């Protein structure tokens, strides 16, 4: 299925590219998320007429993500308090939602979908380095300190 990308998509293309993707990917993800439109003649003409507007929107989103990344880097660390046993193992775990809430409480708006936990939920006390993907091209890390209650 031919689509026109309205956003930069990693491993797929940039704003304005016409790409061929599987039908399900287009119908279930790209089009509902507003990241692409079907490549019909009318849509191609519409996009070419408004190409500068879409590129400017993409540039502002990138700039906003970079500004948020700088704010997260300026935080240095975030502390989360949780119940834990004597050996440092948590009763439960710290998930992406808990980390996003803690960073938001510290003053930087972050959604749980932007938090990347490579090893899964945090299950021990101590320092953990957490990665954030704020945009397709913008990554940052933050030290999360889990303390026993």
From Swiss-Prot:
One Gene Ontology term of the molecular function aspect: rRNA binding
GO BP term, pick one: translation
Keyword RNA-binding found: yes
A Gene Ontology cellular-component term: ribosome
Alphabetical UniProt keywords: Ribonucleoprotein, Ribosomal protein, RNA-binding, rRNA-binding
Domain of life: Bacteria
InterPro entries xref list: Ribosomal_bL9 (IPR000244), Ribosomal_bL9/RNase_H1_N (IPR009027), Ribosomal_bL9_bac/chp (IPR020594), Ribosomal_bL9_C (IPR020069), Ribosomal_bL9_C_sf (IPR036791), Ribosomal_bL9_N (IPR020070), Ribosomal_bL9_N_sf (IPR036935)
Protein family membership: Belongs to the bacterial ribosomal protein bL9 family.
Function: Binds to the 23S rRNA.
Stated name of the protein: Large ribosomal subunit protein bL9
UniProt source species: Actinobacillus succinogenes (strain ATCC 55618 / DSM 22257 / CCUG 43843 / 130Z)
């Amino acid at each position: 299925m031919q689509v026109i990308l309205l956003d930069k998509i990693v491993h797929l293309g940039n704003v304005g590219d016409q790409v061929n993707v599987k039908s399900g990917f287009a119908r279930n993800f790209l089009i509902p998320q507003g990241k692409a439109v079907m490549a019909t003649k009318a849509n191609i003409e519409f996009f070419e007429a408004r190409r500068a507007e879409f590129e400017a929107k993409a540039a502002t989103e990138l700039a906003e993500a970079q500004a948020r990344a700088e704010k997260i880097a300026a935080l240095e660390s975030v502390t989360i308090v949780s119940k834990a046993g004597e050996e440092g193992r948590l009763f439960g775990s710290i998930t992406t939602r808990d980390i996003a809430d803690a960073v938001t409480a510290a003053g930087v708006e972050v959604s749980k979908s932007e938090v990347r936990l490579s090893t899964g939920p945090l299950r021990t006390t101590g320092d953990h380095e957490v990665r954030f993907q704020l945009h397709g091209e913008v990554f940052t890390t933050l030290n999360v300190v889990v303390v026993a209650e």
